[in-house]
């Protein structure tokens, strides 16, 4: 009824990819695909902690995509899961992942390089850190800078456009965000689907899911 010809499951946990493809198979007529979630997996964080080179990590990411049968990579709160487990409610791009000694920026930068070097057709699909928090527009701007000119897609940007000005410490950062997006031609975005009726949230953003 909505006219979709293609749908993409944007958060496939590689370990569950077989089940995802079985469920997608039950959807008739339209084209289907999935994006493999990376950026909080222990193996990748351990590789970065041990300073494995880019080729080593590229091989791991290629192996993950081949075996999950996914179209591309999705990064959700890069490194933020480990921080959340320890009680944190915010995790910015230059914060360090507990126990691993690497920043969220380093994780994002490394996966972005892999996406380009492996010539994955879909740009790196990113769910920025600090979704829904006042002042998170700074995190979104830092994320765009971290791409360093490489192609990157920011998902549901309406939730990253919050500044922290005004009496209540909450304001629109939409102008700052749109100026940066327009200036950086490597960046694409989607606004994010808004449903105006009761919804059920199922998200790999464990902080937001926890608070929902």
Where are these regions (language model features)?
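Active-site mouth loops of central-metabolism enzymes
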Residues: 1, 36-58, 99
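Divalent metal-dependent hydrolysis catalytic cores, especially in the metallo-beta-lactamase
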Residues: 1-21, 25-44, 69-87, 93, ...
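A short acidic, amphipathic alpha-helical/loop segment
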Residues: 19-22, 47, 138-143
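Active-site neighborhoods of metal-dependent hydrolases
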Residues: 56-114, 130-212
